[in-house]
Amino acid sequence: MKAQPPLRLTAQAMAFVLAGGRGSRLKELTDRRAKPAVYFGGKARIIDFALSNAMNSGIRKMAIATQYKAHSLIRHIQRGWNFFREERNEYLDILPASQRVDENRWYLGTADAVTQNIDIVDSYDIKYVIILAGDHVYKMDYEIMLRQHCETGADVTIGCLTVPRAEATAFGVMHVDANLRITDFLEKPADPPGIPGDEANALASMGIYVFDWAFLRDLLIRDAEDPNSSHDFGHDLIPAIVKNGKAMAHRFSDSCVMTGLETEPYWRDVGTIDAFWQANIDLTDFTPKLDLYDREWPIWTYSQIVPPAKFIHDSENRRGTAISSLVSGDCIVSGSEIRSSLLFTGCRTHSYSSMSHVVALPHVTVNRKADLTNCVLDRGVVVPEGLVIGQDAEEDARWFRRSEGGIVLVTQDMLDARARALN
């Protein structure tokens, strides 16, 4: 009998995506949606990057744990990720926080989100589990990381990257030896330790963990019985493994998917208004830092059935144009000028208006003679005629959310409050 080719490692693995976080540093952008459901790049949601990485890596079994403001996220997954077929041994389960039998609590922490769904993970009949954060933007081949995990015999393998020490307070920070074995792990330290020989930077966790499922399963059960645990991977489980087991680091640069267009590995947290705006605006550069045009590593998402973008009017001072910008389907640029901006699906910009370095989420309307610079417009915002943003910092801060970096977040609630105050 002809020998069968060996299974890919990812065929024996599942991705467990933690997608329940609010992302409070994004302020009003997450008032109505969880951070993983926040829009990114013209048509995608942030969670699409983790799911696409898993899909492109060969993983066909996924579970998504949701909690905060989950409706828009669940609807997006149902619409855009509904092609998994049980007949092909493919699964994508959405696991909302719920009070299960004999329990009266929601997810208590990142580890507890997995613990409460042990029976579901068991049903997948997998050998490895890859724990993923659903709120980061990057392209990564998880199979390379999984292969390292198997070759080293680690209890856990943690994805890591180098970040400036000043930014490392938001991450788990680790020390490693010459063989990438983790010797110390601190979750979100107030004073992050630097890398020996490179004290300006720290080695930060990406929130990506690879485990043998049998090992993690036992660890989760013991953690659930510990009254002193916060039931969190970064605070409880990972430090315990570093101390008592074998924890290995995996450098993101070893598995980052790059096309040659990017000059360095790309990973963004987009956890603040400034970071969110910058990462979107970066896509308008002549040579973007993140290549979304890679047909070998597509970012899968829900695609609405909409007509192409349209540009109308061609008279002096009333010409529908977009320069160094991304304009999505169903947008109509009518006699207005768009520069270095990103328009999501279904936006309308009217005559004599101008936009520069603006991120407009779906179904935004910009009325006549508006002049907008350096701002983020939330979904469905209707910008009134003649509104000016980005020229007077004091006036911007009076009505809207102005970030430390000078980026202005505009929501419909803010515009309505402004209209009531001025009338």
UniProtKB/Swiss-Prot annotation:
Pfam family name, one: Hexapep_GlmU
Sorted UniProt keywords: ATP-binding, Carbohydrate metabolism, Glycogen biosynthesis, Glycogen metabolism, Nucleotide-binding, Nucleotidyltransferase, Transferase
Catalytic activities: alpha-D-glucose 1-phosphate + ATP + H(+) = ADP-alpha-D-glucose + diphosphate
Binding sites annotated in the UniProt record for alpha-D-glucose 1-phosphate: Y107, G172, E187, K188, S205
Signal peptide: none
Enzyme Commission numbers on file: 2.7.7.27
UniProt-listed GO biological process terms: glycogen biosynthetic process
CDD domains documented for this protein: ADP_Glucose_PP, LbH_G1P_AT_C
Name of the top EC class for this enzyme: transferase
Superkingdom of origin: Bacteria
Pathway this chain belongs to: Glycan biosynthesis; glycogen biosynthesis
GO molecular function: ATP binding; glucose-1-phosphate adenylyltransferase activity
Function: Involved in the biosynthesis of ADP-glucose, a building block required for the elongation reactions to produce glycogen. Catalyzes the reaction between ATP and alpha-D-glucose 1-phosphate (G1P) to produce pyrophosphate and ADP-Glc.
Family: Belongs to the bacterial/plant glucose-1-phosphate adenylyltransferase family.
Entries under PANTHER family matching the protein: GLUCOSE-1-PHOSPHATE ADENYLYLTRANSFERASE (PTHR43523:SF2), GLUCOSE-1-PHOSPHATE ADENYLYLTRANSFERASE-RELATED (PTHR43523)
Oligomeric and partner information: Homotetramer.
UniProt name for this protein: Glucose-1-phosphate adenylyltransferase
